[in-house]
Every structure is written in structure tokens, then in C-alpha cells.
Amino acid sequence: MLLRFIAENIFSFKDAVEFNTFPSSKSQTHPHHKVDCSHATVLRLASLYGANGAGKSNLLAAIDLLHKAVLEGSLDKIGLYDNISFRFDQSLKNQPSGLAIEFFHAEKIFYYHIEFKKGEVLLEELYISKKTRDVEIFRRDGNKIHINEDYLPKGMSNEKYVDVLDRFIRPDMLLLSFFGHYYPNEIKVITDAFMWFVDSLRVVLPDTVSGYVPHLLDKHAPFRELVNDTMPELKTGISSLEVNKVPVSEETVQGNQAMIDAIREARKSPDTPQVVQRMTEAGVEIANIVFEDGQVWQKTLVSVREDARGHLYKAPISIESDGTQRLIEYMPLFFSVT
């Protein structure tokens, strides 16, 4: 059960923002709305409210990012190459982003926290939260790993154990996932925490914008005309939509396995777009990878807006609100019935 989630210096969050399921100390009614989780009392259900652009979707995206990172076991495998720190303060650009989650599972309250910059884990720690103190299970600070010897296999010292781990753990890898995937029987308490991400945590997001829209907008003139006639009338601030189209190859995306796989699939099926999700500084971006005219292209959507002086500027579609992205997503349906 999710108890608390904290995000800092990521997407639209500059300072640490917390979402939790703890009841207000002032509320003494509706006891059936609460449930005991070890020493903590939490709500069975919590909702998130806020104005358009307040960060609701980004909070869910941050939870989804952590979930995917743990399941995959690597920041590289989820395409986390670009800086996704808070984008409106340049002083934070080179500072790490942080995600922390507290949850109840296997009769224990766990606290898991990571800090990272681009594709490198800088800090990772797992604790068991008790009523009066927190018990460290492991802590990884840079390339220094410490595991609580109370949880190590009998006869194994922390120094010897960590020496072995250092040979396997790359900077992009998560220690929690390494144990969960490859050594689930080694340290049970770590496996318990990992299995909560596998079996219990589910993140349901709105269907991603784009899909095949970048390719359709690029190649189908009637659809492009309809979209750009309609968007200004919807009062979203967008004057038109364009496609950013750049050539890509396996050499230009070295290290990004998702892109490499998409390029190879695109070559097998010319003119059929492959959909790739990427993490960028602006947020989650959907790209179409298409092999056409003897070249592999990456196509992404950009919105064209007008500033206060009447100058046009372009921005990635990923910075638009969920509502605006949903409108764009419905454009193929709208086109099919007109």
C-alpha cells in the first residue's frame, strides 16, 4: 500500500513535493476510512486535486518513472538520458533529481529513495520504518555500497559482500532491482521491497498523446490541414502543430537500446512508424521512428505558439497540459468522421 511519495527537482517540481495517504490529525470521524499499516494509520483512498497545470500529471509521471526504473533495473533501459531536472531554474540544471516512496508490504513499512542525474544513480537507499526509528537495509552513495550486516548471509562481512557487488553494479543500475531480479533468495527483506513494485504498484496514466500522429501529420496533407485549422479554435494557445523530423542511425543513438531496437524494426518495415517513448528535459516525449526514402527518421510533434510580442516560437508537445494533449490525441478520430 502506498503511504507517501516525494519528488524533488524533476519535471515541474523545484522543491520537494509530497503526496501522502495519512489522515488529518483533526479528523476523528469515519474511522472505517482508515486502515492500520504496522505503526501507521492511513487512508484507504486518497485523491489528488489541483488547477490545470498545477502538476497532477507530473506527479503521476514521476511515480511511473520510478516504477519503470525499478522494474527494468536500469535508468538506461527506460531511456533516461536527458536532464529532467526542474527546467525553469538554471541553477538546478546540474543538480540531481530525487524520488522517494514509502509503502507497506509484507507487514513492514519500507522507505526507498534514489537521487540521479541523467542516466546515473548518485544515491540509493532502502529503510524499514519503525515506530521510533528507521532501520537501514542498504545505502549506496556514488560507488560506495553499505549493507546492514544483520541482513547479510551468515559468515559474510559487509566488506566482502560489497566487493563482489562492485564488480556487477553499473552506475545506471538500481541495487534494489539487482537483488530482486538476480538474487531474490539472497536477502529476503530486499526482495520483499522489490516485489511490491512488481506485484502491487500500478500506475494508470492517460493514453499517451502522439501514437502515430507525428507520422500522420507529416505524410497526410488533409489531416495536417484539418489539425491546423482546428487547433486555433480550441483556445489552447497553440497556433499550429508541426513535425520535427531528423535523421537517426544506430551510431547517433549509441547506448539507447530502445531507439536501436526501433531503428532495426523500422528498417524491416519501411513506411511503418515505430513508437518510442523518451524522457527529455521537457517531460515524456513520443517519437515515431520511420524508414522512408532510404533513410531512418525520427519524427516528434512540436506546438507553435505566439508570444506577447506576436513572435512565433516552437515547443515540444510534452510541455502541454494533459487536456491539450488529449485534444491532439483525438484528432485522428475527428478526421475519420469529417
How does the language model describe each region?
Residues 111-264:
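Electropositive, glycine-dotted interaction segments
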Residues 1-9, 218-248, 269-289:
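Amphipathic alpha-helical domain-onset/packing element
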Residues 45-48, 264-335:
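Conserved ABC ATPase signature
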Residues 1-65:
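Pre-Walker A-like glycine/lysine-rich segment at the N-terminus of P-loop NTPase domains
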Residues 99-104, 126, 303-305:
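Short beta-strand segments that buttress and anchor functional surface loops
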Residues 34-47, 51, 60-121:
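Conserved P-loop NTP-binding catalytic core
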Residues 14-16, 109-111, 133-135, 311-315:
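Short, mixed charged/polar active-site loops
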Residues 14, 94-96, 107-109, 118-122, ...:
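Coil-to-beta-strand transition motifs
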